[in-house]
Amino acid sequence: TVLIVEDSRFICEAARLMCLHSGARLRRADSLAAARRHLNVYFPTIVIIDVGLPDGSGLQLISELAGASPRIGVILGTSGDDLMNHQSLKAGADGFLAKPFENLSCFQSTILQLLPVEQKPKGPIVLQDAPVLPDLITFRDDLVQALISLKDYLSSKEEGFIRSFLARVCAASGDDYMQEAIKTGYIDQLCAKIEHRIGQIAIL
């Protein structure tokens, strides 16, 4: 079982498809609080933790799990910022997955090489390189959540987090229109562009 701690539904869907291709089952937690509730009940084989989460830094959870006993077999940090690779390893992660998750064979090989010997698949391993194409509905869901958050935000720090979330999701989806829209300085203009894109996806 793989637990992913990630607030983007689109990125989680990409991970779910990769796990499906790999014969693994994925569970999702969208925050540190949700992850801790999950870990109180389940003990996953692998946990993938986004460094930037709505209620705090994923590095904190990585550090907690790395020092826990018994220890989860594989702890991975993930981020759209490659500089977080070093920070994740420093916190105690076994490895790092860069976003967006696009290459299935890279996803599989990263996990396989870190699995404890007793948990590695027996026999020859054929890495797959099938395309991973998450449903656009999950991308729309992320845009809707970002739009709601932008309209309710209370501080520049919250605005920065929402823009960072949008940047990660739009890069993962390859949406050039939205990647350009994020550069808009005014909140009302950005909200209008998000609403426009949501409407376009609904028509598809």
Question: Regions from the language model: what does each represent?
Answer:
Residues 28-46:
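Acidic, metal-coordinating helix/loop segments flanking the phosphotransfer/catalytic sites
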Residues 9-30:
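Two-component/phosphorelay signaling modules centered on CheY-like receiver
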Residues 125-204:
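C-terminal output/effector regions of signal-responsive regulators
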Residues 49-50:
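Active-site residues of response regulator receiver
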Residues 54:
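The feature encodes the CheY-like receiver
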